[in-house]
Amino acid sequence: MTDMLREAPLGQIIRWATKNKLLKYPEERDDFDLPSTYSTLLDAAETKTPILSRTNTRGTNHAVESEHQRTRASSPLLSDSGIAETSELEDAETEKEERSPYTAADKDVEALSLNRARSRLEAMPYTEARLELEAELSLARTETRPIVPLKTSDGNILVDWYTTDDPANPQNWSDAKRAFVSTVICLYTFVVYTGSAIYTSSEEGLIREWGLRPVDASLPLSLYVLAYGIGPLIWAPLSEIPVIGRSPVYASTMALFTILSLPTAMVNNFAGLLVLRFLQGFFGSPCLANGAATMQDMYSLLHLPYALVAWVSAAYCGPALGPLLSGFAVTAKGWRWSLWEILWAAGPIFLVMIMLLPETSTPNILLRRAKRLRKLTGDNRLMSQSEIDQKEMTAFKILAEAIVKPIEITFKDPAIAFVNLYTAIIYGIYYSFFEVFPLVYPVSYGFSLGMVGVVFTCILIACMIGIAIYCAYLYFYLVPDIMKNGLRVQESRLVPALFACFGPTIGLFMFGWTARESIHWIAPTIGITIYGASVFVVMQCIFVYVPLSYPQYAASLFAGNDFLRSAFACGSILFGRPLFVHLGVGKGVSVLGGLSVIGIIGMFALWVFGARLRARSKFAMS
């Protein structure tokens, strides 16, 4: 608990206020002993011990080669049946050897331990080497051993984890600690996403009190959704700056989100409400920008999909449960009640975040460790890899890359263009439900405002069905297949989506043409459930496929995808009601169902031609 408080924003504030006298790190305590791997290297450097050259390490290299041979023999990922042939891996290693900034002796030490390699790769985006290494380490338990720091060719000593089971490494945290952090992130995500649609129950109240048109009354929802699509373009790259990290971004923006919830619930003019709702969405968006990255910090490749299922479920169910949470209360207490509920939900989450949410970013953790070791030893050669990388990094360059790169890739890469278009359509259709449900269930079936909110629980049921299907696929097929055959081509992750992509079209047409008085209300509700469950599976598959195929640009692509999805959803909220009013529910929903056919064609095209598209793309990993 002390470690969590120390790493949390409140703990860092206490340390700053007391000049690091409270909540000390191990390196700051009197009883701390510098690991022998560091002291030996520092002492050797002081006595100017020559670094072994490639010519006098022939025996060491032979031992390393033997170790690699034993590793390959026992590893399904590095065997002849794996993704890459041994000769290909050796060629790649030889090529990297010529460009490596590390000394030969240091590379020999590194090669003796898969865990040693892991600690450096955790700070990198997804690459083929990292994916294979993550899977390898998840499949085999290795004994605890000290990690030898690398020395660069210019004399810097790279600060790393002290041992392979270093408790400071988020991947080594206990299951309980990782579950706690994951729960906080999921609740945070749920609150922010619920804050979008929880307002829909208040639209009729605004229309009556301020004399608004229905399309105007939907603007506070659409601007909120647009804002949390814009936010990731800024918050995602900002949290990747090593000196900042993720936790400060979470805490500072959640503080503003919580504070803004108070004037939002009390504002007395429509223009002010629009501005405040936009700011709410903008400052709530880091959960959308960084939630998946936080899960990736803590979980290995094989376990990450399960963590992402939980996080995506929180985001998926939030908007659906918003009308349920506010529907009955708004009817009894007035339209402002839904906005007060956002404050009541956000406040406790913010307190937990600021007091107990630790930093998970490996570059940030190691950067701060390097600073402490420099202060302890007085040796400025002790640096983290992120500090070296950060020298070439500016906030403007990072933001420009995050904004420009997704646009460039979308126009130049057909696969990403399809993914962005399809997810935008799916997301827009999802948010159009908040405009069509009030035209169906109260009008055709006499439901009250509160009961319309209850209907939205079908999305929750759909999500549970989607979770069951996707987790069964992971548990019974994907993970065993990786353990047996290694990582297959990226398109193999799309197999569940090939079946699920028919669901959105079927569900929409079923809803559109059964939503009438002569047919029981359960029929259109089943259609929405089919839509929701199938969309959940499709989105999971797509969001795994993108970082596997485009590892170097995964963060930028997700930020761009978030913006496009939210922009389309913003528009769908505004055009949804006019569409359904003028065409009728059946024809209006059929238009959306027709658009969803793009997903069927595109998904099969991506599965068949994906490898060829990646081979031609300068952005993808083939």
Sequence positions of predicted segments:
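Pair of pore-lining "gating" transmembrane helices in MFS-fold secondary transporters
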Residues: D175-S196, K412-Y430, T529-A533
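C-terminal transmembrane bundle
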Residues: Y193, G205, S222-V225, G229, ...
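Helix-loop-helix hairpin linking two adjacent transmembrane segments in secondary transporters
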Residues: A315-N364
